[in-house]
Amino acid sequence: METVQELIPLAKEMMAQKRKGKMVKLYVLGSVLALFGVVLGLMETVCSPFTAARRLRDQEAAVAELQAALERQALQKQALQEKGKQQDTVLGGRALSNRQHAS
């Protein structure tokens, strides 16, 4: 059934057979569902590039946020290490001065 023109005679023939009226309803239901499927597929095809671009932007934003968090964490760690070195220097100087006085 390549064209719609072939469907019309088929529907008339099926309507002529009174016992198979349920089959006509079934074919009509199937045709309507197939048409909805085609329309939804076309909509998805048309809208797909926009959703893909949005996902890509969201992913890039998440990566940038993660990198910023890692940089902040590295700076905090570096600041703590420098503070620890300063305290070690101060404590080391006190220990040397105590030794000099004790001798």
Curated annotation (Swiss-Prot):
Keywords noted in UniProt: Apoptosis, Mitochondrion
UniProt cross-references to Pfam families, sorted A to Z: G0-G1_switch_2 (PF15103)
Tissue-level expression: Widely expressed with highest levels in peripheral blood, skeletal muscle and heart, followed by kidney and liver.
Effect of residue 35 to A: No effect on BCL2-binding
Induction (UniProt): Induced by TNF through the activation of the NFKB pathway.
Main location as per UniProt: mitochondrion
Effect of residue 51 to A: Reduced BCL2-binding
GO cellular component, one term: lipid droplet
Protein's GO biological process: extrinsic apoptotic signaling pathway; positive regulation of cold-induced thermogenesis; positive regulation of extrinsic apoptotic signaling pathway
Effect of residue 54 to A: Reduced BCL2-binding
InterPro entries: G0S2 (IPR016821)
Subcellular location: Mitochondrion
Result for mutant: residue 55 to A: Reduced BCL2-binding
Source organism superkingdom: Eukaryota
Residues covered by region (Disordered): 80-103
Task of the protein: Promotes apoptosis by binding to BCL2, hence preventing the formation of protective BCL2-BAX heterodimers.
Self-association state and partner proteins as the record states: Directly interacts with BCL2; this interaction prevents the formation of the anti-apoptotic BAX-BCL2 complex.
Protein name as catalogued: G0/G1 switch protein 2
